[in-house]
Amino acid sequence: MTGRVALVTGAARGIGAATVAALAADGWRVVAMDLCADDPALPYALGSRAELDRVVAAAPDPAAVAAAEADVRDPDALAAAVRLAEERWGGLDAAVAAAGVIAGGVPAWQVPPGQEQAVLDVDLGGVLNLARVAVPALLRRPEPRRGRFVAVASAAATRGLPMLAAYCAAKAGVAGFVRALAAELGGTGVTANAVSPGSTQTPILDESARLYGLPAAGVFAAQQPLGRLVSPAEVAAVIAFLAGDGASAMTGAVVPVDGGLAL
């Protein structure tokens, strides 16, 4: 994979940070993007610039990873991150939509509108916005193209999780979107896929535990036949596979990385 270029959103921590690490270890050059600020609509801390800088510093070659602060709800900011990849490294070969937030803890009709909108705008709108600016860049690569668009969905896309209605709706939308995008990209050499993580050791799972009044996120492990939580690195390994040549025959897939949660 040496010489290929990726853009990863939500890169300061969790699955996004692990994806940057996995791609960098495989020789990719990566634009690691995150908002690096809290959202006043959400009751928990989001990724910080310090965390993003640590992701960059941990890469085998920190010069091959560029940090970018941008909001996935802002198409112009996303376009600037794509331009950074093209201007610094000559193009874009993969776009990974890993930014996500969560809110809830009460029935759908009681969720504050600002929280609900934040989840929909980041978790679904952010994926659409990334595709809007990244897919044209993937298509600008010369033929035969090997472009990859990969989004992070969730096992919540197919499960009716109480008190997390907006999150379930957004992730179901991600799964549907990548299938439609894959159909639209047919014949171009660019593919679109998603991963569907189960309960994964991330700040979002910590917040989920708080929303459910649980003592720790580890309680969710009991739901998965694997008997433990999934690690961000395990999800990132599948994302890196989908971004690579080994997944060239896969498009429109939503790949479970869920410890058997969907069984």
Please annotate each region the language model reported.
Residues A131, A170, V178:
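Active-site helix of classical SDR
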Residues T2-W89, A103-V106, G114-Q115, E207:
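Short-chain dehydrogenase/reductase
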Residues P136, A183-G187, S248:
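Alpha-helical segment proximal to the catalytic Tyr-Lys
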Residues V106-A108, Q115-L120, F220:
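Substrate-binding pocket helix/loop in short-chain dehydrogenase/reductase
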Residues W89, R228-V257, A262:
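C-terminal substrate-recognition "lid" of short-chain dehydrogenase/reductases
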Residues S154:
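Residue(s) in the substrate-gating loop at a strand-loop-helix junction
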Residues R146, G186, T191, M250-G252:
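Short, small/polar-rich loop/turn modules that mediate ligand/substrate recognition or access, typified
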